[in-house]
Amino acid sequence: MSQKQEEENPAEETGEEKQDTQEKEGILPERAEEAKLKAKYPSLGQKPGGSDFLMKRLQKGQKYFDSGDYNMAKAKMKNKQLPSAGPDKNLVTGDHIPTPQDLPQRKSSLVTSKLAGGQVE
């Protein structure tokens, strides 16, 4: 059994060595391509944040996606200002439940209704 294990181990090592050499060969062409691209386009990949124009636009502050977002933000600002001019909080309501005796008498109407005339035709 030990002979079989020894035979399998060298085969595995050679397979691993082949993979290592393939990876190294695969990396070298990639490095060469990267070097060519960097030589052709030197300004790419230098700034992680992007172009100066993009950075300037991002630093200006909050921007809105469309007019709907702008209008919603504008409405929120108005809603924050409205409660400051709210009603007097000392006013108490609902202490007394009115009864028919407490209500003032209705004023009679100057024009009589044909329905309330009482005449039957």
Swiss-Prot record:
Organism the protein comes from: Homo sapiens (Human)
Sequence similarity: Belongs to the endosulfine family.
Tissue-level expression: Widely expressed with high levels in skeletal muscle and brain and lower levels in the pancreas.
Recorded superkingdom: Eukaryota
Function: Protein phosphatase inhibitor that specifically inhibits protein phosphatase 2A (PP2A) during mitosis. When phosphorylated at Ser-67 during mitosis, specifically interacts with PPP2R2D (PR55-delta) and inhibits its activity, leading to inactivation of PP2A, an essential condition to keep cyclin-B1-CDK1 activity high during M phase. Also acts as a stimulator of insulin secretion by interacting with sulfonylurea receptor (ABCC8), thereby preventing sulfonylurea from binding to its receptor and reducing K(ATP) channel currents.
Biased composition (Basic and acidic residues): 16-37
GO biological process terms on file: cell division; G2/M transition of mitotic cell cycle; mitotic cell cycle; regulation of insulin secretion; response to nutrient
GO molecular function: ion channel inhibitor activity; phosphatase inhibitor activity; potassium channel inhibitor activity; protein phosphatase 2A binding; protein phosphatase inhibitor activity; protein phosphatase regulator activity; signaling receptor binding
Any Pfam family the entry gives: Endosulfine
A GO CC annotation given for this chain: nucleoplasm
Transmembrane segments: none
Subunit structure: Interacts (when phosphorylated at Ser-67) with PPP2R2D. Interacts with ABCC8. Interacts with SNCA; interaction is disrupted when phosphorylated at Ser-109.
Stated name of the protein: Alpha-endosulfine
Chain segments carrying region Disordered: 1-53, 79-121
Modification type Phosphoserine: residues: 2, 43, 67, 109
Localization: Cytoplasm
Keyword Cytoplasm in record: yes
The keyword Nucleus appears for this protein: no
InterPro entries: Endosulphine
Residue list for modification Phosphothreonine: 21
Keywords associated with the record: Acetylation, Cell cycle, Cell division, Cytoplasm, Mitosis, Phosphoprotein, Protein phosphatase inhibitor
Modification sites for N-acetylserine: 2
Primary location recorded for the protein, binned into one broad class: cytoplasm
Post-translational modification remark: Phosphorylation at Ser-67 by GWL during mitosis is essential for interaction with PPP2R2D (PR55-delta) and subsequent inactivation of PP2A. Phosphorylated by PKA.
